[in-house]
Curated annotation (Swiss-Prot):
The gene is thrS. Residues 637-659 are annotated as: Disordered. Catalyzes the attachment of threonine to tRNA(Thr) in a two-step reaction: L-threonine is first activated by ATP to form Thr-AMP and then transferred to the acceptor end of tRNA(Thr). Also edits incorrectly charged L-seryl-tRNA(Thr). Its EC number is 6.1.1.3. Homodimer. Binds 1 zinc ion per subunit. This is Threonine--tRNA ligase. It is found in: Cytoplasm. Belongs to the class-II aminoacyl-tRNA synthetase family.
Amino acid sequence: MIDLIFPDGSARQYADGSTGRDVAASISKSLEKKALLIKLDGKLLDLDRPLTPDLLGGGNRFEIITRDSPDALEVIRHDTAHVLAEAVQELFPGTQVTIGPNVEDGFYYDFARDEPFSLDDLPKIEERMRQIVDRDEKIRREEVDRDAAIADFEAMGESYKAQIIRDLPASDTITVYHQGEKWKDLCRGPHLPSTKAVGKAFKLTKLAGAYWRGDQNNAQLQRIYGTSWATEADLEAHLKRIEEAERRDHRKLGKTMDLFHIQEEGKGMVFWHPKGWTLYLALEAYMRRRLDAAGYREVKTPQILDKSLWERSGHAEKFGHAMFMCESAEGEVLAVKPMNCPGHIQIFNVGQKSYRELPLRMAEFGACHRYEPSGAMHGIMRVRAFTQDDAHIFCREEQVTEESARFIELLRSVYSDLGMHLADTKFSTRPELRAGEDAVWDKAEAALSAAAEAAGETLVLQEGEGAFYGPKLEFSLKDAIGRVWQCGTLQLDFVLPERLDAEYVAEDGSKKRPVMLHRAILGSFERFIGILLENYAGHLPLWLAPVQVVVATITSDADDYAQRVAERLTSMGIRAEVDFRNEKINYKIREHSLAKVPVIAVVGRKEAENGEVALRRLGGEGQKVLSLEDAVRALTEEATPPDLARDRAVAAPAELAQA
């Protein structure tokens, strides 16, 4: 007999070999009909998998998974990928299947086929997929002999599957899943009971190229992407989100707002246009003020350093594949820096440091370069050249919790100023392969956890996902349409100071290694600007907008007045331009609205005579007529960055008291 413990804490006994379906049926017929999978000690398994003592992990925690469970969704997506593969092979005989995982919001499958798929093929494939769902093909797991499986897949013409099996560790159990009587795939599972359980809430979304095992030296494959959901309503909501995301695409906004471009001769390198660079500098100036106020000292380190430094730091071994290397005429092997931390330790190491000088907070807006494959790059969000809002805090062990908590408070404040808020904070603990003693890891993990709790953060645990040199916190934002972006990081490092010989004189006169906290808030300026553009759909807060006000004339006899208005705004720090063109005012308004200018100040003969401006807001209806000075006062206040606005609010009562 086997003992199972249910989520409510109750326990029942079942005969060896009972399945999840048997357990569901013993509870109720309705649950048996709804059941799709089981979860045993946290692991998802097929509903019809026999439950035996060797399968139970000892905890015997048992749960029946139905369609409305989040756990079911990833399996629904995986099964949809299998239905896609069967449909493709039915419609296009001779096509080989390779891999087909579920991914965020959907799935894909990579196919080996001489003739390329076209977008016109996708509706045909979708229709065949629906037919396969209607056929209610039973999905059955089978453990097979390794050599027999290789021979079987080779005989089927599935050389990629045979190669996957050959490369699996000898200790691995080889499992095949049958889908109906005619189709099968190599897979670990788990899977749903039948294709009918997949449902029809799916859609194929795009085609892409891929390489076998992600290596451009291998065969090129064709990838079909799709999305799959538990219900039609969920699918419809997702498609609307995609439509909205396309409308907000930072690449389109970058063009219509004239912010930046990327071209073939500089793949993954951003050409910032004047307006885009103005936005960049506004964000950089804000971050510089926030770091300065928080006690950071800004530094600048070289772009290119001798490879030997990267070998000592360990980066050449861990990140060598992503580093740009070059050789000088004198035979020096140099590397363009992929990150800033080794350079910061070089600055720390100049001169003897005392415990009294710690914590030492060192910041750099450091330009870094990392190789990204062409297919992986995406606008300014994933590039080869980027600038990090990077900083490293050198501190004593007993300062880690306080410094971490201070950083989290700063991070939250910055995100709030930028109109973004934390979605979650992930806590990644020691990986299997790691440096350092367990006792040191115990202290490090406890310190980060305590800091997060002190800052009021609820942590999402990611066991074994920490860096090899220390645990880390990852901070994710949720944007206006519900997408989550991982941006901020806080990593505790007790390895790099050892490797690069960083030390300070302790209170007792002994030499000790500082603890190093790697931290970033934005991550990179390029990516974060892309996130901001998409979050705001280009309608940035006034203080960040590259052009804050356009003064647009109705008739040419208001040109002189328009120029005076622009000069008055500019004198107060407002980024203003004048549109004197001989075009209708509605045309000008439409054009500047498409360029996402937040405020259009309309002036004509009447406004010139009265010393007024008619303010029209982006996305608003109508306009508000104000005197020039009232408009300047209101816009100046609104265009003040939030940190400066707070400083002025604090200073105002003190000034009044002195008066």
